[in-house]
Design a protein with these regions (language model features):
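Sec/Tat signal peptide C-region and signal peptidase I cleavage site
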Residues: 28-32
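Bacterial N-terminal signal peptides
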Residues: 14-27
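N-terminal secretory signal peptides that target proteins for export/translocation
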Residues: 1-11
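A compositional/structural signature for long, glycine/proline-rich flexible linkers
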Residues: 33-448
């Protein structure tokens, strides 16, 4: 459908007296915003929500007592108390803020023999760059200077210049533990970020509360102007879709009846439809695993971008890491903590052969997504676990409330009887077979 523009420009005519002009203008009917159809509303809402989720995260981060822009926060190592923890890396994070005259500088230490990356994302969740040995083989460490778009500000000699998509960016760093947590933490603390001056930093715009359990209603359109003005979007459909957002914002503001109509469509059709897409269709379902292999850079697909921001904000690109999420067994039945299962990797398709860095698999309970306590304090396996292979060179991982007959206990990942669970398989530095969707972890097969 065609949506009206936001305003009508009336050019004064010198030859007409003010009184006559007033009469003429009084006879022109006022423009009324058109009611959108469901598809147009869905497109605009999902697009706007994507930026809203990123703003929500900035507000959450900025509320921390020690928060400052251009200062790294060194996260403590993941523990069993975290939600869906990554027990394989030491994390660091920051918000970068620059202006035309003021770059920010990142110092990356020399790291050898273990995986690391510094992921830089824009304010919509698009990955700008990863800084590591793979992406900067001639300079994997040293000084990296972040500058605003179009900025000609000088940077230190020898620094690598990286142009951001806007005046802010999110930084997420990861350093592989590799069986040496103390060494990883020592390296983590050597990453440093600082501004080259005092940049002008705009606070994140005010937005209505966004709850994942009950997504925001039409009130998000009341904030459309500040939300869209707060960050440049590289999506090729941005200009077109933002016009749809503005038109619907005008319609919502036109009266209580219009707002009620939009809220009804959101509640009954748009939000349920989007959640169904995000949870079941936003990523491929291969070999009974949900595969997050198309994230990080989304092109025109802002629906996939918003899904990623909702389900796990700041997703990385598949060339860096691919996640497989398992919620169902080989019969497509929900994974049950009371049952026993086996994952059987063929000898010619072992997980370590599919990655350039490392792999891991972790079990968490559902719906709390926390690791399952057990007497072995065993929550995950990875490249460095002492897994015993089969005589033919294949490898089995057993899953269940007790060891599985025929599988070494060293290969047993405990579950909690009576509770459903989820598996997350992470492949860091995935090789071509994973990226090309030719390899997935084996299906989680029930033991009869």
């Amino acid at each position: 459908m065609t949506l009206v523009t936001r305003s009508l420009l009336v050019r004064p005519i010198a030859a007409i007296s003010a009184a006559v002009l007033a009469i003429l203008l009084a006879s022109v009917p006022a423009f009324a915003a058109d009611a959108p159809d469901e598809e147009t509303l869905s497109d605009a809402y999902v697009y706007l929500l994507g930026r809203g989720l990123a703003i929500r995260q900035e507000h959450i981060d900025a509320a921390a007592a020690d928060f400052e822009y251009n200062v790294i926060h060194y996260n403590p190592l993941g523990t069993a108390d975290f939600v869906n923890p990554n027990l394989d890396v030491a994390y660091l994070e920051a918000w970068i803020a620059v202006d035309d005259d003021t770059p920010a500088l990142l110092e990356v230490p020399k790291i050898e023999g273990r995986y690391y990356t510094v992921q830089i994302l824009d304010e919509w969740g698009e990955v700008i760059v990863n800084i590591n040995q793979r992406t900067f083989p001639s300079m994997p460490y040293g000084t990296f200077a972040f500058v605003a778009p179009g900025s000609t500000a000088p940077i230190p000699e020898g620094a690598v210049r990286i142009t951001l998509h806007g005046r802010k960016a999110k930084l997420l760093g990861r350093v592989e533990l590799k069986g040496d947590p103390e060494g990883a933490v020592a390296l983590q603390k050597q990453f440093m970020l600082r501004s080259m001056g005092t940049p002008r930093i705009a606070p994140p715009p005010t937005i209505p509360e966004i709850d994942n359990e009950k997504l925001v209603d039409s009130t998000i359109f009341d904030h459309a102007g500040p939300i869209l003005a707060s960050a440049l979007d590289i999506n090729p459909l941005a200009a077109q879709t933002q016009q749809q957002v503005y038109a619907i914002a005008d319609y919502v503001a036109s009266g209580d009846e219009a707002r009620a109509s939009i809220d009804g469509m959101l509640k009954d059709k748009v939000i349920p439809g989007f959640l169904d897409y995000a949870l079941t269709k936003s990523v491929p379902y291969l070999n009974h695993w949900m595969v997050a292999d198309r994230s990080g850079n989304y092109g025109a697909d802002y629906r996939a971008r918003t899904s990623a921001n909702l389900l796990g904000i700041w997703a990385n690109v598949p060339s860096e890491v691919i996640y497989f999420v398992g919620l169902r067994d080989s019969n497509d039945k929900e994974l049950d903590g009371s049952a026993s299962y086996v994952m059987h990797f063929p000898a010619d398709a072992l997980p370590q052969a599919q990655v350039n860095s490392y792999w891991s698999v972790i079990l968490v309970g559902v719906p709390d997504y926390k690791v399952v306590s057990n007497s072995l304090n065993r929550y995950n396996f990875n490249t460095y676990s002492d897994l015993v292979p089969e005589p033919d060179g294949s490898m089995k991982i057993a899953i269940g409330p007790k060891p599985v007959e025929g599988v070494p206990e060293s290969n047993w990942l405990p579950s909690r009887a009576g509770s459903p669970f989820s598996l997350t398989f992470r492949a860091y530095g995935p090789k071509a077979p994973i990226i090309q969707e030719k390899w997935q972890p084996p299906a989680v097969t029930p033991v009869e």
